[in-house]
């Protein structure tokens, strides 16, 4: 390449920082902003000599899931769940269910973020919010079940958690790809 790379665009090892296509990119000196700037979807994951996906370590998985759990959520309700998939047969089936996208089957690990009202309902039932005695005891109306607006909020919360997971994966040197 004939483009000049300034010192600010060098990695810690002195090598030029390049984008997905090999072109030099500018860096800000801020690790989070640089991760966000340089992140792109990965559809070809690292393979070992036997053409198996390179495993994501337990420590990497824990860090990514912890980052996802730190995402803000409406009312701190976290009305979503994260399904972790490492079994090849399940990855194969997921690839088929998601419009036959083979990169899912070739990934070492997949996370599914789903709206999950069960947590809300279980909590309300546990503390008696649906019982007539609740009104008597607290002077408040009985709590309602989740509605359509709550579904939208829960879906947004799930996507915020997913974005935290993506940024954490990128920070750990792992690629990711959202599947709709």
List where the protein language model places each region.
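Acidic, surface-exposed loops and disordered segments
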Residues: 1-180
């Amino acid at each position: 390449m004939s483009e000049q790379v300034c010192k600010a665009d060098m990695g810690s090892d002195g090598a030029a920082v390049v984008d997905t296509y090999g072109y030099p990119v500018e860096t800000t000196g801020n690790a989070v902003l640089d991760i966000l700037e340089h992140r792109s979807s990965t559809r070809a994951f690292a393979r070992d000599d036997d053409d198996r996906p390179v495993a994501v370590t337990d420590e990497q998985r824990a860090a990514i899931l912890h980052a996802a759990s730190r995402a803000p959520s409406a009312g701190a309700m976290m009305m979503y769940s994260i399904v972790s998939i490492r079994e090849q047969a399940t990855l194969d089936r997921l690839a088929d269910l998601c419009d036959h996208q083979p990169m899912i089957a070739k990934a070492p690990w997949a996370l599914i973020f789903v709206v999950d009202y069960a947590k809300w309902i279980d909590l309300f039932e546990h503390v008696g919010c649906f019982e007539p005695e609740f009104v008597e005891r607290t002077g408040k109306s009985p709590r309602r079940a989740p509605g359509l607006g709550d579904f939208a909020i829960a879906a947004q919360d799930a996507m915020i958690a997913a974005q935290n997971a993506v940024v954490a994966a990128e920070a750990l040197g792992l690629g990711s790809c959202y599947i709709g």
